[in-house]
């Protein structure tokens, strides 16, 4: 019973998105010129090649930042209700922090925190 309802809702959502995209494509104005394909940054014309390679280090630092940012998102609510959770809550957050510290130690050992 609920599976049928789920399928109907998903198909309806897909159909509505397809109709909206189709209508937008049908009624949108089309103008092709040389400036439309140019890349820009903050309204300033590009100098040199527009496709540049970035070092992987930026992405690695971004992923590590996100990992520890998510840790903070989990720690703040835990700190608010720490007294109500008891021993189980303490051990669960300690387990979480141990896994996080092990991940940090692994990244440090592999040299992910060193800028090359």
Swiss-Prot record:
**What species is given as this protein's source?**
Phocaeicola vulgatus (strain ATCC 8482 / DSM 1447 / JCM 5826 / CCUG 4940 / NBRC 14291 / NCTC 11154)
Q: Which reaction does it catalyse?
A: a quinone + NADH + 5 H(+)(in) = a quinol + NAD(+) + 4 H(+)(out)
Question: What is the recorded membrane topology of this protein?
Answer: Multi-pass membrane protein
Q: Does the keyword Membrane apply?
A: yes
Q: Which family does it belong to?
A: Belongs to the complex I subunit 3 family.
Q: Which GO terms describe its molecular function?
A: NADH dehydrogenase (ubiquinone) activity; NADH:ubiquinone reductase (non-electrogenic) activity; quinone binding
- List cellular component terms (GO): NADH dehydrogenase complex; plasma membrane
What protein is this chain from? Answer: NADH-quinone oxidoreductase subunit A
Q: Where is it located? A: Cell inner membrane
Q: Where does the chain cross the membrane?
A: 3-23, 61-81, 85-105
The alphabetical list of record keywords is:
Cell inner membrane, Cell membrane, Membrane, NAD, Quinone, Translocase, Transmembrane, Transmembrane helix, Transport
Chief place where the protein resides: membrane
Its biological purpose is as follows: NDH-1 shuttles electrons from NADH, via FMN and iron-sulfur (Fe-S) centers, to quinones in the respiratory chain. The immediate electron acceptor for the enzyme in this species is believed to be a menaquinone. Couples the redox reaction to proton translocation (for every two electrons transferred, four hydrogen ions are translocated across the cytoplasmic membrane), and thus conserves the redox energy in a proton gradient.
Q: What is the lineage of its organism?
A: Bacteria, Pseudomonadati, Bacteroidota, Bacteroidia, Bacteroidales
What EC number(s) does its UniProt record assign? 7.1.1.-
